[in-house]
């Protein structure tokens, strides 16, 4: 088995909103980065654990871990996948693992996996303290 045989991007579960993680693989002095995501629903707990478990199962089927392979999580975020307009947008950060180091590289990976879609992204922006709602009910 070679790391090149593993798909770069896999978004599972259909739908339009996904939570994704960037997974860094190392095996036999070879390194590779892959993206794995699952359909995100606000009521689904521990989506990150489900993504990691799904990736571990996929890699385990190929004997990756038995042969000394290592998997590290390098952050993640959310994906809006619009099939009708054929566009994909990456945004936000993962609440457990934070944001990945190079979102542009992740966008290019997704663009290669879905060449018929326009891919865009923006990074997580810090909350601007000046945008806090004012207390319109206060009486002075």
Where would I find each of the regions flagged by the language model?
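Intrinsic low-complexity, intrinsically disordered or marginally ordered coil/linker segments
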Residues: 1-140
């Amino acid at each position: 088995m070679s790391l090149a045989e593993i798909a770069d991007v896999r978004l599972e579960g259909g739908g339009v909103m996904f939570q994704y993680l960037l997974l860094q693989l190392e095996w036999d002095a070879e390194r590779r980065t892959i993206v794995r995501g699952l359909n995100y629903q606000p009521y689904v707990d521990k989506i990150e654990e489900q993504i990691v478990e799904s990736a571990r199962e996929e890699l385990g089927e190929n004997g990756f871990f038995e042969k000394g392979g290592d998997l590290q999580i390098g952050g993640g975020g959310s994906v809006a996948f619009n099939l009708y307009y054929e566009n994909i947008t990456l945004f936000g950060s993962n609440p457990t693992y934070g944001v990945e180091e190079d979102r542009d590289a992740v966008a290019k990976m997704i663009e290669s996996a879905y060449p018929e879609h326009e891919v865009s992204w923006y990074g997580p922006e810090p909350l601007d303290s000046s945008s806090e709602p004012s207390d319109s009910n206060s009486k002075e």
